[in-house]
């Protein structure tokens, strides 16, 4: 077979946890190649909410999702990882020597001694709301994520939904948009109480509108919205100005072919041990939101902890028989040389 791409560790998923795995593995001199279904690194952080602030990363009282991705890319730069984007892993085969052969949906073939699954919830796509005639406006004036807040400046914005994303963007985009109308089918929300209270306070100050009901119609031309019809509220059918719309009806998460890899999935999650974060298949590890174990918290912080322990176990597979010496980056000259901070 020709055209095989060989590496020490193949990482499936280039979100924050997959990126930090490169750092921890790199400290042990393991070469990494990352595959992601998106067209860039960062996972959901970069694709769905790049400008959304994150508050629970140690040392960063507040950092945007894209800012975190950028810092991680800077941090792993000394290890020169390889990336393959716009690809889904399709098949996995364990070879006689214990290594793995992974094929993508474009028939690219990778071989690695270790496979790390850091695929979050798998591939995802937003759920389309049941609004008649929405398709021609998608990508032009109807969007399912916020990549740049500036894209909404000066627009009459209608946000539809009752979860955290809907409330967060209602609050964050209110200073930018010309007007903001939040639409939810009932006055109760599935969002953080503090966000709900802030929204109601802003409504009292007439800084935004909240309408109980459902969007049942759109008006516009050539992909550009001009208004939206809301039905079901106490005022009957009303038409509100709308030049931008953000529907938040959740995501459809698909694990894809990984589900067929014999990893004893439970509720679409991969069970792992908490010593090495290894799956039921030796040599395959799962870190981040994709894994499951008692006490699991779906936090980026938890994923960072998991990859630190995973890297030690991966090193024993990649370099069997080699003595592993635990070192601190603060005091180890050899590690500091790898990071490029000393000559």
UniProtKB/Swiss-Prot annotation:
| The protein's required cofactors | FAD
Q: Where is the signal peptide?
A: none
Task: Quote the InterPro entries the UniProt record gives.
Answer: FAD/NAD-bd_sf (IPR036188), FAD/NAD-binding_dom (IPR023753), Fd--NADP_Rdtase_type_2 (IPR022890), Ferredoxin-NADP_redctase_2 (IPR050097)
What EC identifiers does the entry list? 1.18.1.2
The residues that hold FAD are: 36, 44, 49, 89, 124, 289, 330
PANTHER family documented for this protein: THIOREDOXIN REDUCTASE 1-RELATED-RELATED
Q: Which family does it belong to?
A: Belongs to the ferredoxin--NADP reductase type 2 family.
Name this protein carries in UniProt: Ferredoxin--NADP reductase
């Amino acid at each position: 077979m020709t055209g095989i791409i060989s590496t020490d560790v193949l990482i499936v998923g280039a979100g924050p946890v997959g990126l930090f795995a490169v750092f921890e593995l790199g400290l042990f001199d393991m070469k990494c190649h990352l595959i992601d279904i998106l067209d860039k690194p960062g996972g959901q952080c970069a694709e769905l909410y790049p400008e959304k602030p994150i508050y629970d990363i140690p040392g960063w009282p507040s950092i945007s999702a894209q800012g975190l991705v950028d810092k991680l890319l800077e941090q792993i730069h000394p290890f020169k990882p390889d990336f393959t984007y716009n690809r889904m892993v399709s098949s996995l085969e364990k070879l006689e020597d214990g290594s793995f052969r992974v094929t993508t949906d474009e028939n690219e073939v990778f071989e690695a001694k270790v496979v790390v699954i850091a695929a979050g919830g798998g591939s995802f796509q937003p759920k389309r709301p049941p609004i008649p005639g929405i398709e021609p406006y998608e990508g032009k004036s109807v969007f399912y994520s916020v990549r740049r807040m500036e894209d909404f400046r000066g627009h009459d914005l209608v946000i539809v939904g009752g979860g955290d994303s809907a409330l967060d963007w209602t609050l964050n985009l209110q200073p930018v948009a010309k007007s903001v109308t939040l639409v939810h089918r009932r006055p109760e929300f599935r969002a953080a109480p503090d966000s709900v209270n802030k929204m109601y306070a802003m409504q009292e100050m007439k800084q935004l509108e909240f309408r109980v009901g459902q969007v049942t119609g759109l008006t516009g031309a050539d992909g550009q919205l001009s208004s939206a019809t809301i039905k079901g509220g106490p005022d009957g059918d009303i038409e509100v100005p709308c030049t931008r719309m953000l529907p938040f009806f959740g995501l459809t998460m698909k694990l894809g072919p990984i589900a067929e890899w014999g990893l004893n999935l439970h509720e679409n999650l991969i069970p792992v041990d908490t010593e090495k974060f290894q799956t039921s298949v030796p040599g395959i590890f799962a870190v981040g939101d994709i894994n499951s174990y008692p006490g699991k918290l779906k936090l980026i912080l938890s994923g960072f902890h998991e990859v630190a322990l995973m890297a030690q176990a991966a090193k024993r597979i990649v370099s069997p028989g080699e003595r592993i010496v635990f070192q601190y980056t603060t005091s180890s000259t050899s590690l500091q040389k790898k990071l490029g901070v000393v000559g």
